[in-house]
């Protein structure tokens, strides 16, 4: 077998076009592109405002089964499908999220796709890119600094220092910072209190950036952030601290979508980056909405499996914006299905049709769940070299028995040529106008009942459980006028349950809600379930140990 090039080698060998040429293909004049070098640019707010008058194209969601720790190629399939649609003569734009440094140097790797289905410049996108994450981190931590500064200078707002809910953030996996005590060292440093750090992609500021429609909406949402409570339990908002204006200044450029290209020189927006296991898991509304005005088809993804990313895409992003997906693609891999059927990670390369069929129950559950939202779906089998013909046929047969179709895709190895069949099938599905999209629950349902609805209908658990403190907090928020908000479930991505080792399609499990957080600016309530952490830790052998600069100054080991 010939040597297989690494993702970074493939990306580095790509023949890129100037970003102005990519923009021109979308009708974006050079004066409306704010270039960051020769191969990436932001699209101006003026162009976006003008484009709003145009009709929308069709929106395609790419989601997946519950993943293995290495991911199953959802971003790769999103990029590949965008290239495939362009290959068959459709004008298509890919919309994906930006990469977080945490998983890049941790375990999962970057977020630019893989093989011959990548967005480029891959190194930039996976590292600092256009500085959006820096802007989000800075705006978030500016608010943190203003809170402690206000308390230091007399606390005119009467903030109860025991009830400061705003934590600090950084874009790195660092478990040592989950719980801290700040302002130690004497009176000159303020009043000591407990605090902590989350990863930047879990920040409410990141969620706001990704849900805001324009600068005015951004600043209003920033002002709506609840940072603390007084002793009478009344909320303190970011605008009470006069923080919203300065935060908006830091985020002004970050709000503008980033335009790049695929390996095949097709356009892609890479913008925003909330995780789907601890946040809402979708790229920005600004990028998606703008792309829909510029293309026949927009292919976007939602993080991790359909139980997390797709549910939040439908119940948060689409609910808040009026977006209506025309079709969904569920990415599955033979190896992940075998793992869901009980095969150990080190044995996934060996054929095991029986385990595969057992694991297909996980895929079937996701197909059923997508149908609950009224969106037609098709399954993409993301091909790996270790897949056998018998295993592939078993997946096809299982999906066919569910009344759906599975298409084998080789875009990782072959680019758009390897996903052309799926592109044709997706067009037929979208143009059938079979989509009857509707969210899972109504706005006026009580908050805990919304949580229970997701647990019962999506996770197939028996119920959610929470202690009296959590229930009382939800009731208080309802009394304060927040009961209409959707809920954002934070839980493990590896299972329908909160036990990451419980694979397949478990039923009647109990989902414990450990904590709830109100993201009043973003417009949802976060329910933290099981042992999930909003600041991840690094694995025993992090990817950072294998990333370095070679003698020529090029990056090696990034994936």
From Swiss-Prot:
Q: Which CDD domains match?
A: FTHFS
Top-level lineage group: Bacteria
Tell me the GO molecular function terms. Answer: ATP binding; formate-tetrahydrofolate ligase activity
Which Gene3D superfamilies does this one have?
Domain 2, N(10)-formyltetrahydrofolate synthetase, Formyltetrahydrofolate synthetase, domain 3, P-loop containing nucleotide triphosphate hydrolases
Gene Ontology annotations of biological process type: tetrahydrofolate interconversion
The reactions it catalyses are:
(6S)-5,6,7,8-tetrahydrofolate + formate + ATP = (6R)-10-formyltetrahydrofolate + ADP + phosphate
Q: What is its EC number?
A: 6.3.4.3
Q: In which pathway does it act?
A: One-carbon metabolism; tetrahydrofolate interconversion
Output the Pfam families linked to this UniProt entry. Answer: FTHFS
Binding-site residues, ATP = 68-75
Keywords noted in UniProt: ATP-binding, Ligase, Nucleotide-binding, One-carbon metabolism
Database matches in HAMAP family: FTHFS
Similarity remark: Belongs to the formate--tetrahydrofolate ligase family.
Q: What is this protein called?
A: Formate--tetrahydrofolate ligase
Q: Which organism is it from?
A: Chelativorans sp. (strain BNC1)
